Every structure is written in C-alpha cells, then in structure tokens.
Amino acid sequence: MVVSVKVFKKATPNGKVTFYLGRRDFIDHLDYCDPVDGVIVVEPEYLKNRKVFGQLATTYRYGREEDEVMGVKFSKELILSRDEIVPMTNPNMEMTPMQEKLVRKLGSNAHPFTFHFPPNSPSSVTLQQEGDDNGKPLGVEYTIRAFVGDSEDDRQHKRSMVSLVIKKLQYAPLNRGQRLPSSLVSKGFTFSNGKISLEVTLDREIYYHGEKTAATVQVSNNSKKSVKSIKCFIVQHTEITMVNAQFSKHVAQLETKEGCPITPGANLTKTFYLIPLAANNKDRHGIALDGHLKDEDVNLASSTMVQEGKNTGDACGIVISYSVRIKLNCGTLGGEMQTDVPFKLLQPAPGTIEKKRSNAMKKMKSIEQHRNVKGYYQDDDDNIVFEDFAKMRMNNVNMAD
C-alpha cells in the first residue's frame, strides 16, 4: 500500500508565486510549538532583481466589523515573524523531510522557509456569527503571507501577494490522568428544616472532541421539599481578554423527570450522558470554534491549556473552559440549586488510538469528497497529493478561495 502525503498549495492572482504547505494545523505543545515550514516557488524572470518577503501574522478581532465607525477599530493585527525568503538569508537552513521532498520535486525555483510562533501566543479561536452577519468573525486568526518587493516596507500589491489562513491548536497530554472531578453542594430552606445535598462526579478530567461526558448525580433529600426535575448542561465559558469580557453558552443539554419527584427522605443516583458537538450548535451565536463552522473538520474550541505553574489568567487572546452544570428544580417555593464541575475538552494527542481513528475518518471523507474535484491531483513519482488551498466545506468544496 502506497501512502500519499497531502500538500496544500496557493498561488498569487498573477500565478507567479506559489505557496506549498504540508499542513494547515500547527500544534502548541506548551513547552514548544510546531514551526510553520513550507516551500515557495517563484518564477525568476518575474522578480527582476526584486525579493520575496514572508510574514507570519495574527489578527485578533474583539468587536463587530459593522460597529467600526469614526476610525475606531475593533481588531489588532500583529506581525509575529518576518523574513526574506528569496534570496535566502540563511542558505544553510536545516530543512524538514517534507521541505526536502518538495524542493527536490519542484526544482531550483523552490525556496524553503520557516517561521516560529512566539511563546504564549494564543490558540486559534473563532466565535460563531449570527446568520445575517456577513462581517469578519470575532476571534484569533493566523495568516502566513508572502509578497514581492524591493524591501519589507514596500506597498503590498494584491496581484503579487499570496496569503493563507492556518490554525494554531493544542492537544491533550498523552496521559489523561486518574483524577475524577467532583463537586458537593447542599441547600437549606427558610422556615423548613433539613437540606438537599447534591454531589456530581465525572468519569474523567479530560475528554476528547466527540466523546460522551458521563456525570454521576447523587441527590440526598433530607428536607421537607421535593425535587421536581433535573437539568444537565455542558457549558462553554469564553473570556475575551482584550476587553475583559466573559460569557457562557450551553453547548449540550437535557432535562428529565425520571426518578422524580425525589420526595423527603429519598435518595437518587443516576448517570447522565451528554456529547458537546459543533454540529449541534450551527445556529448558536457566540459559540467558540477552533475554525469556521463551514469547515468539514471544525470542532468546538478546545480548552485553553497553560504551562505547569501558570494559570489561565496569564493566557491571552480568547480563553476557553468547560464545565458540567447540574440544576435541581425544587418547586415554586424551593427554587433551584446547581453546581458546576469543570473539565477539559481537547484534541487527542498524536500517537493515541483516538487520534489514529480520527485521522482515518478524516482521510476517508477527504478521499470521497475530492475524488473528482479540480485542483486535487496526485504525483505518483513522489506520492505527493497537491491540493489547492481552500476552505473545506461540509457538503461541498468551494475552490474559489
């Protein structure tokens, strides 16, 4: 069986400069981050003694584009890294195996490049827009771009500039640990003796995207009130650090009266299962995603991870966390009682069985979707599959990027 390697490509409008990237997702391992490595091909007669410059940039949009009036901007663009790609400033640069293969295949006009994310740079996050909002979405987005000019300060012309969006993501640690998060609360009532105790325990601390969360609920009713119903939620908590804004959204929920009412002196132990999925929140404004909802492989935004010894308060960009929330309805006069149990929602780490299964499913979908798509072709000599860099759609492929 021959294993092909997919390579993404994108050219300038005039077709004179072409980007080649071996991947679109780059992983933050907390102690280091994958470098952005690729190859750029430029026609030498087009340069005419000019140079090709590259940039790694991030755009942090924290307000709606339509609200930008009187010169007020609700976005920041930062150039994280820049370099002169052609001619190379470091001819002894160590190339990755993918770069070596591409340079060998594409010839003398191919030039490798490498950019690095700075420490503590935020992960890619997109906040889902409202249906009638056609502006740029809120969130953190990374772009790799190249342009032709005499110097880095030259005005960038669209016809000779190529840019493509990449993602910076985080993976779960290889070991998910043995800790079982739990919470215990109790509630008393005015003019009534006794309390209702609620204990919630999760079966693990780290869940992968698409996995069931199992919450075991134990209710002990030592009061004179009755529990009428139980509500379960998975809550996504979002913090936009630039404007110090925080909000929460339910990404999965259920309500049940099974085992209810829980009368005075009675107990109940029951396990509830919920699956938080981006596909079930297509029309929910403000839901945080790790890409755009129209992408075929989009997930809910992963929990923000920080290095050991630091807390999420030190993180920048958009900070994401999750919790399971259980609410008990204690009647009209008794009100509600609730508790939250935090957990982490992450991508499975490379090398794990879950990651291999996920990659296999994505590969099957990709082969099926792109089998007859123009711009997707294979070079049998080096087992390289070239694909025009474009957004992958859920139901079709739009190659007009």
Swiss-Prot record:
GO terms for cellular component: cytoplasm. The keyword Phosphoprotein applies. Inner and outer segments, and the inner plexiform regions of the retina. InterPro entries: Arrestin, Arrestin-like_C, Arrestin-like_N, Arrestin_C-like, Arrestin_CS, Arrestin_N, Ig_E-set. Coiled coil: none annotated. It comes from the Eukaryota. Undergoes light-induced phosphorylation, probably plays an important role in the photoreceptor transduction. This is Phosrestin-1. The lineage of its organism: Eukaryota, Metazoa, Ecdysozoa, Arthropoda, Hexapoda. The gene is Arr2.
